[in-house]
Design a protein with these regions (language model features):
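Nucleic-acid modification enzymes, centered on SAM-dependent nucleic-acid methyltransferases
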Residues: 2-117, 127, 131-528, 536, ...
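Conserved glycine-centered beta->alpha loop in an early N-terminal alpha/beta scaffold
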Residues: 120
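Conserved SAM/SAH-binding loop
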Residues: 123
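Short, glycine-rich nucleotide/cofactor-binding loops
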Residues: 590-596
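A short glycine-rich, Lys/Arg-flanked "PGG" loop and its adjoining helix->strand segment in the class I
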Residues: 596-614, 643, 647
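Short beta-strand segments at enzyme active-site cores
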Residues: 614-620
């Protein structure tokens, strides 16, 4: 017996959906991408459209109401109009638009919409949009970082919907709960206790971040430092030279017209120091990098290093760093200054007594630093960065306790039930504030490690983040951001993004949502539900390996709040569905078999869960060059996905091409990035 068709099985306003999905990638304020980094997120517009059109009947399902093709087309156009409004970012929480969309879902499901499960929840777009449309959302993932992202998106905010801020500043300005919708009160408290953390951290370690003296010709006085620009160094391979050779890939600081600046290496015998020069950088000083990887020219003698030589010295822990320039907050923009003794001494601090650590995988595809002796995640941070991050992390528990005490003072029930146990009283609220503060620190690590570059863009000179690509590359000249400045890469900037997400993007709803750590290959017990998911793409992204960078810091801050979730030292990897040969002694065949078997078991579980009258939707991202150029066959990942779906008992009833990435973003420029998705 054939089932009545849903809209997604017949027609979609694809151009409108793709236009909104593509536009969304450039939206920053309030978007989930600003809550916490996750790789290859699906656009909210696409997820919203797919869920809604999978639930709403196509007019052809009701010939008694729409007996002619003309009548069906007219009704279809009416539904398209609802969907075209629904996918717009500006309408994400528009009550009229959402009410119209939800009414159609109820009409097509006899007022009994199904729960939705995403077994590979990842960045949380699909569960969030299910919640927005009034569904009971279930988000499962094996990765604790992904689990926390989903908790922060769909589980925690509804629990404290409409909560008035509890902090003392807000209490003096408020009269009742009027005006605080959704998670806006929670956002206000995250901002307040984040400011307290910043002040307290500066009281403890602010002396490590002195202001820089500004010469008279640049305005005089002192300036807050935005960033320190460093170069890694090794001893020159020429025995007659032996200088500490800077491994700088660029000496350009600013390309802004009329404000160009660069770093000039000054050699005196076998010593090198640096002076900042204003004006356009001469071509011969743009870079001393002369080949791929670690091939550099010595400024003293002209000797060229080999990649093997630098790796050898790195593994022997004989690689150093030298300060090349200081970036300050000027009265009219950035000012660039030569390093001085005070700034160099301030950075020379011992490592803190304890800090998060964990071994990086020996997988050069995604991790370059281990080849140069940086084998632990802690090796990716300077001692000053470790000191700042551990200080911030230690303050999360203190801020959490203050928020709990203030919540009790405002009358929030003091039931002592933990957030992880489903609590919604004062203790749970304090812990909820702590979760978002911990997210701010996690985001800060992406801008406060020695893999961050100085982006000398013509329009904006800023500290770049470590994950410009879906990998951790080796960086030779790096920017150390001042976490207490007013520039980018600060804790307060990260918390500002988080608070905007809570205020803008979180739906104002009370839909039940459940997030748990779960292996997609196991039976979770759900039945007669809707399933929509964005599974891993064979070997494209090593989620578990990459997320360890964040996990070690998140665990430091939240292991007492979610002890079960953070019981392991690193992210679980044995069951992760990624075809990674290095986990199988380099065997591509074993990696392929592992992925194929795992994906088949997953699809078999999904088949058990799915409600017969609602199509299962699966995203498969691809690049147009995603073919084997030698055999001219489709990629192994695509074949594996189709095989698993069909062998599990499904029939593919339709496919839709959806734009899900910006083609010009950094990771797609010359790399095997995922440009579009096919929705099955």
């Amino acid at each position: 017996m054939s089932m009545p068709k849903k809209l997604i099985e017949v027609a979609l306003p694809l151009e409108a959906i793709n236009a909104e999905a593509a536009r969304e990638k450039s939206i920053r304020h309030g978007h989930p991408s600003t809550l916490h980094l996750w790789w290859a997120r699906r656009p909210l517009a696409a997820a919203r459209a797919v869920i809604w059109s999978s639930l709403v009947d196509d007019p052809s399902a009701h010939p008694e109401l729409y007996p002619t093709e003309e009548a069906q087309n007219a009704e279809r156009q009416r539904l398209f109009g609802i969907l075209e409004k629904l996918v717009k970012w500006e309408n994400s929480n528009d009550p009229e638009v959402l009410a119209a969309a939800k009414a159609e879902i109820l009409r097509s499901t006899n007022n009994n919409p199904p729960a939705l499960l995403d077994p590979f929840a990842g960045g949380g777009a699909i569960p969030l949009e299910a919640q927005r449309l009034g569904l009971e959302a279930h988000a499962h993932d094996l990765n604790p970082v992904a689990v926390m992202i989903n908790k922060a998106m769909i589980e925690i905010p509804p629990r404290f919907a409409g909560q008035v801020p509890v902090n003392p500043d807000s209490r003096t300005r408020l009269d009742g709960a009027a005006g605080w919708q959704g998670a806006q009160g929670l956002a206000a408290d995250v901002q307040y206790y984040g400011e307290w953390m910043k002040r307290e951290a500066f009281r403890r370690i602010g002396h490590l971040y002195p202001k820089v003296k500004v010469p008279h010709e640049l305005g005089g006085g002192e300036a807050t430092v935005i960033a320190w620009i460093w170069a890694r160094t090794v001893k020159c391979p020429n025995p007659a030279c032996g200088c500490e050779m800077p491994l700088a890939s660029t000496f350009v600081l600013s390309k802004k017209k009329g404000k160009e600046a660069w770093i000039k290496p000054i050699t005196e015998g076998n010593n090198v120091h640096f002076e900042v020069q204003y004006g356009k950088c001469p071509k011969e000083y743009e870079s001393f990098k002369v080949g791929r990887s670690a091939v550099f020219k010595c400024p003293c003698c002209g000797e060229i290093t080999t990649d093997a030589y630098v790796k050898q010295h790195g593994k022997a822990h004989e690689m150093g760093s030298q300060l090349m320039a200081v970036v300050g907050e000027g009265k009219h923009g950035r000012i660039y200054l030569s390093p001085d003794v005070e700034q160099t001494i301030a950075a020379d601090v011992p490592a803190p007594e304890s800090y998060p650590s964990g071994a990086m995988p020996e997988n050069p595809r995604w991790f370059s630093p281990p080849a140069f002796g940086m084998t632990d995640y802690s090796d990716l941070f300077t001692n000053r960065q470790l000191t700042a991050l551990t200080t911030f992390s230690s303050l999360v528990a203190e801020a959490q306790a203050k928020a709990e005490a203030d919540a009790v003072a405002t009358g929030v029930v003091n039931d002592h039930i933990a957030l992880s146990a489903g609590g919604s009283g004062a203790r749970a609220y304090g812990e909820a504030v702590g979760v978002y503060l911990a997210f701010g620190i996690d985001k800060l690590t992406n801008y406060s490690c020695s893999l961050c570059t100085w982006l000398n863009q013509p329009k904006n000179e800023i500290v770049g983040n470590a994950f410009g690509r879906q990998a951790l590359p080796m960086v030779w000249d790096y920017a150390e951001a001042n976490p207490f400045s007013n520039g980018g890469g600060t804790l307060m900037q990260q918390l500002e993004y988080i608070c905007k997400f809570l205020s803008i993007c979180v739906p104002d709803c009370s839909s039940i949502s459940k997030v748990q750590q779960f292996d997609a290959q196991s039976d979770c017990g759900l039945r007669n539900i809707m399933v929509s998911s964005d599974p891993p793409y064979y070997d494209n992204i090593g989620y578990a390996d990459l997320s360890d960078f964040f996990y070690v810091w998140m665990r430091q801050s939240l292991k007492d709040t979610y002890p079960k979730l953070f019981r392991t030292m690193l992210v679980p990897k044995a069951e992760e569905l990624v075809a990674t040969p290095y986990r199988f002694d380099g065997s591509t065949e074993k990696a392929r078999d592992f992925f194929e078997n795992g994906m088949l078991h997953t699809c078999q579980q999904i088949y058990q869960y799915a409600r017969e009258d609602i199509p299962v939707t699966i995203y498969y991202a691809y690049k147009q060059s995603d073919t084997d150029e030698d055999s001219k066959t489709a990629s192994t990942g695509w074949e594996t996905m189709l095989s698993a779906i069909i062998r599990a008992g499904f029939a593919i009833t339709g496919t839709w091409p959806m734009r899900t990435e910006r083609a010009g973003r950094m990771i797609s420029n010359g790399t095997n990035a995922l440009a579009s998705s096919i929705v099955l």
